[in-house]
Every structure is written in C-alpha cells, then in structure tokens.
C-alpha cells in the first residue's frame, strides 16, 4: 500500500504504512498551513491484528492490504475527531491483543 493523501477542513493528511514488519505501524501525518501539525500512529503486532480482525492474517501475503485498510479505517475517524476538536497533540494508538491504549 502506498501513501494516501486527503484533505479535511484546513488540513492535509498523509497516511500509509510506517513499518511493514512487526510491530506494524500505520501513520497519519497531518499538516496545517504547510507545516506538520501532528502525527497519529497505530502500532500492532500480528496477534493484535488477528484479535481485532479475525479474518485478517498479516502472515498471508493476500491479507497485507486488508490489514493496512483495517488500520487506516481505525485511525480515520480518530484523526478527523482530533482535527474537529483542535487537538494537535501527536498520539500513538497501541493495539495489545483485543485492547487499545492511546498514548
């Protein structure tokens, strides 16, 4: 999966895989006015991906794009909510088994 670029309100969002090996990371980089405003990173190991999406197995080559799509979907609404509230702090969402921890 390559980087995707979209706009929301006055922000430009660049999203895509950060690390393609465990722990997998998916990164949203948000710019406002041409400057980086914040990053939102999702980090997960294979077991956590399977716990959240039982039909997706990162070890299967055919499922890798599905994994990136699932991580993108998980972060999309959270990034928009951060923009809506004006929260420009960088955060990392860690998937640990079926639980989530945002730091």
What annotation goes with each model-predicted range?
Residues 22-66:
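Amphipathic alpha-helical packing elements
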Residues 48-103:
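Acidic, low-complexity intrinsically disordered segments
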């Amino acid at each position: 999966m390559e980087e995707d670029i979209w706009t929301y309100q006055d922000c430009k969002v660049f999203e895509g895989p950060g690390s393609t090996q465990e722990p997998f990371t998916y990164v949203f980089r948000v710019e406002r006015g041409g400057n980086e405003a914040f990053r939102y990173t999702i980090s997960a190991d294979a077991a956590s991906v399977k716990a959240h999406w039982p039909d997706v197995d990162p070890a299967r080559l055919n499922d890798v794009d599905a994994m990136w799509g699932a991580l993108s979907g998980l972060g999309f609404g959270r990034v928009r909510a951060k923009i809506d509230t004006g929260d420009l702090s960088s955060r990392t969402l860690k998937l640990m088994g079926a639980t989530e921890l945002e730091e």
